[in-house]
Amino acid sequence: MNTLKMQRRIAAEILKCGENRIWIDPERIDDVASAITREDIKRLIKEGVIKKKPIKGQSRYRAKIRHEQKKKGRHRGPGSRKGKKTARMGKKELWIKTIRALRKELRKLKAQKKIDRKTYRMLYIRAKGGQFKNKHQLYLFLEEHGLLKK
């Protein structure tokens, strides 16, 4: 049996694709084997004996399912994590999250008149300095120093 290597190469050049994407009709292999010029190959392409196969894509089916599961909070356990804690949530992001929560709490306390303006400002600056890791520590400090008004 003929390998049709030359015909395949010429067809690939004409159809502007790789040699692996060339389909040759198995019924008309003898016609293709006798084709030696570019014109012969072009004629066979026109007749539909030689065709260009479609590109094989990469299926997103499994990826979509996995993404849906991740949206539900699955696949996020310690065994699935790669990289440090800071790689998953940056230090700055974490700081912003913490400081916003503290400042919101301070504003709430000031609005409820549980702390005065002077105390608010002092606590605001201490929060900015990183004295409080979370709201719990803020409240511990307030109780320790008797700064909360009843």
From Swiss-Prot:
Q: Which GO terms describe its biological process?
A: translation
The record's section on PROSITE patterns has:
RIBOSOMAL_L19E (PS00526)
Q: Which UniProt keywords apply?
A: Ribonucleoprotein, Ribosomal protein, RNA-binding, rRNA-binding
This molecule's function is given as: Binds to the 23S rRNA.
Transmembrane domains' residue ranges? none
The record ties this protein, via Pfam families, to: Ribosomal_L19e, Ribosomal_L19e_C
State the family it belongs to.
Answer: Belongs to the eukaryotic ribosomal protein eL19 family.
Q: Where is this region: Disordered?
A: 55-89
Looking up InterPro entries in the UniProt record yields: 60S_ribosomal_eL19_sf (IPR035970), Ribosomal_eL19 (IPR039547), Ribosomal_eL19_arc (IPR033936), Ribosomal_eL19_CS (IPR023638), Ribosomal_eL19_dom (IPR000196), Ribosomal_eL19_dom1 (IPR015972)
GO MF terms on file?
Answer: large ribosomal subunit rRNA binding; structural constituent of ribosome
Quaternary structure, per UniProt, is: Part of the 50S ribosomal subunit.
* Cellular component terms (Gene Ontology): cytosolic large ribosomal subunit
Q: Which organism is it from?
A: Pyrococcus furiosus (strain ATCC 43587 / DSM 3638 / JCM 8422 / Vc1)
What is the protein named? Large ribosomal subunit protein eL19
